[in-house]
């Protein structure tokens, strides 16, 4: 199965007060924590491709060496400032060019998600040939999420700031759950007070 690991690094960070993806955390930018783990994961699986979609030229510049080394690909999406649907559409169009059978969407503002958890999620979805899937913790669904090829067209039809959760809800009976016990792993950074490395012992690789 050809899988595109789709990394959303294009948010506007309105509630954070500045670009949260570039904010320093434990020695590197927020967006690099999970990205570096996903790059390792993709490198261990022959048919998995890592694709970063961003509206930020600085992120493109910083990732250029990894692109040159063949560790990931990038897509510039300036329209992402209008909403997450534009980021998703740009990523899906790139995934289709890669002839992907499925894509997994990861958010760049989840720096605490462990490498082991991310890889187990991907392997579980691939092994089950999941039509749709997402993580669950405490009865709540969240990112990352999984979409097989039959749902790509619906993802491209999203508008404004509507994300993939709308597609999941529409086909809830087809969603395969992946349980995560540690809620802090799924914590996303909307505000500076959400920074919680001190509570988790650091952003371990």
PLM features: what roles do these ranges have?
Residues 81-149, 153:
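Conserved beta-loop-beta/alpha segment of the NTase-like Rossmann-fold superfamily
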Residues 24, 112, 146, 188-189:
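Short aromatic/basic micro-patch
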Residues 22, 74, 132-134, 175-179, ...:
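Conserved beta-strand scaffold positions in the cores of enzyme catalytic domains, especially
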Residues 67-70, 151, 171:
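Short, structured coil segments at secondary-structure junctions
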Residues 1, 5, 153, 157-205:
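Conserved alpha/beta core of the MobA/IspD/sugar-nucleotide pyrophosphorylase nucleotidyltransferase superfamily
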Residues 2-55:
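N-terminal glycine-rich phosphate-binding loop and ensuing alpha1 helix
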Residues 33-101:
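Conserved N-terminal catalytic core of the sugar/cofactor nucleotidyltransferase
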Residues 18, 141-143, 186:
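Glycine-rich phosphate-binding loop of ATP-grasp-fold ATP-dependent ligases
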């Amino acid at each position: 199965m050809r899988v595109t690991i789709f990394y959303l690094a294009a948010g506007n960070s309105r509630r954070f007060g500045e670009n949260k993806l570039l904010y320093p955390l434990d020695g590197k930018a927020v967006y690099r924590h999970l990205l570096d783990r996903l790059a390792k994961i993709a490198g261990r699986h022959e048919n998995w491709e890592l694709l970063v979609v961003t509206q930020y030229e600085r992120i493109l510049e910083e990732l250029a060496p990894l692109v040159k080394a063949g560790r990931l690909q990038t897509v510039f999406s300036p329209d992402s400032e209008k909403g997450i649907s534009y980021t998703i559409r740009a990523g899906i169009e790139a995934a289709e060019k890669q002839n992907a059978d499925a894509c997994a969407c990861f958010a760049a503002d989840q720096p605490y998600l462990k490498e082991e958890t991310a890889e187990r999620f991907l392997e579980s979805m691939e092994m089950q040939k999941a039509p749709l899937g997402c993580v669950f913790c405490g009865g709540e669904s969240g990112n990352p999420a999984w979409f097989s090829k039959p749902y790509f067209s619906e993802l491209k039809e999203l508008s404004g700031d509507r994300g993939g959760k709308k597609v999941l809800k529409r086909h809830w009976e087809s969603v395969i759950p992946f349980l995560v016990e540690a809620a802090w792993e799924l914590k996303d950074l909307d505000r500076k007070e959400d920074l919680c490395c001190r509570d988790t012992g650091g952003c371990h690789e």
